[in-house]
Curated annotation (Swiss-Prot):
Name of the molecule in the record: Probable nucleolar protein 5-1
Compositional bias ranges of the Polar residues kind: 433-450
Domain Nop per the UniProt entry, residue ranges: 280-398
Source domain of life: Eukaryota
Disordered as annotated region, ranges: 402-533
BP term (GO), one: ribosome biogenesis
Family designation: Belongs to the NOP5/NOP56 family.
An example molecular function term from Gene Ontology annotations: snoRNA binding
Amino acid sequence: MLILFETPGGFAIFKVLNEGKLSNVEDLGNEFSTAKLARKMVKLVAFDKFDNTAEALEAVAKLLEGTPSKGLRKFLKANCVGETLAVADSKLGNIIKEKLKIVCVHNNAVMELLRGIRSQLTELISGLGDQDLGPMSLGLSHSLARYKLKFSSDKVDTMIIQAIGLLDDLDKELNTYAMRVREWFGWHFPELAKIVQDNILYAKAVKLMGNRINAAKLDFSEILADEIEAELKEAAVISMGTEVSDLDLLHIRELCDQVLSLAEYRAQLYDYLKSRMNTIAPNLTALVGELVGARLISHGGSLLNLAKQPGSTVQILGAEKALFRALKTKHATPKYGLIFHASVVGQAAPKNKGKISRSLAAKSVLAIRCDALGDSQDNTMGVENRLKLEARLRTLEGKDLGRLSGSAKGKPKIEVYDKDKKKGSGGLITPAKTYNTAADSLLQTPTVDSENGVKEKKDKKKKKKADDEEEAKTEEPSKKKSNKKKTEAEPETAEEPAKKEKKKKRKHEEEETEMPAKKKEKSEKKKKKKTEV
């Protein structure tokens, strides 16, 4: 029986010298305790060395998929025809058996043999030492990891970080230069700033026109619309601006050239950023767009660092200052950061922006991880998630105000609110009311409805009379009782005014007795004063 063994340097085939010991699997490990015992157990038959790292990577990658490489098939055909081959992978053994017609074996005894060969590998294969095996294993493992992650120079996200930074700087520079052109040329032609709103079109118009006197002779059709051109020419005739020299106009035109060149380079840079984003992060680009995706990568440091972040962090990425201020003051934390500028969040109503940004952040994290570590190079995942988000946005926008969370557990019966509804059916007990056209006629013609109405009124009057008579009967005994109470209370009320009159007389008599005493005291005081004088 032969054994196929894979090493970082190549494929080796060993022959089992003593197959009788394979029956005792537990003691097989003792047969490889020393190099001498190992040489008695197995013997190297053939060795196929890899020429370079690329060949080794290709062979190992095929083995991981469970298929033999082209070199391995040739090697097995040359050395294993008519023999039984022990392999470490049962899937690989099945494919070798189908394609090469070689009987393959995979069991516990084979695994013990492979473990023993690995422990004495440098002794069994001459010319392969530990100093060679270590670097081979390290290089092959790095290459294999790079192959699994599909790492390539196209995936370098440094270009995106630099490009988005330069794009932001260009926007600031363009805005500064354009405002300088408006302020400078505004002294000569101030009305032009209101007529032409776009900065690039303004710079083109100033460069073409120069002095406002030339506006009537020039053709602005390539730059401006017909209506704006006519308005510009009318305003140039009656402008309130001051006159400027040719030297001033020369410098203004040079500044306009700078604005136009910067705008042209910005457009080229944006196209470059677009292509790089579609190459490096296609799923993220499909979800949030090129600019927002590039800013997220730039803020995260790299695409791989961003893939390690959770959805809650990606949601508020760019709003760190507001987050820490809210935590410090114990207020509500922000709901979104850079992700707020995505088109999906912009389409949502203000009350739904928080929900959509949370959903978008969760989907964006999945897209980032797929872009950074996935095998696919297309944007199918991003497009699917964007459609899901748009569907969720439509459901949020169309949801009833009364049912914001979940659905009602129990629905009320219609009979509670509508008494005319039949139980168990949708019909009405009473017939539907129809409009009475006879009520509109001026002639007083008696109708069935009117006669019924008169009868109902008479019945109501009779009922009222009967009710009044009953009330009168009940009120008569109560009146008698009240009259008796009044007669009993009358003598008491008659005695009360007599008592009051007696009290008044006593007070009057007391006041009369006190008055002469007071007069005497006053006269005595006057006499004393006269004597003192």
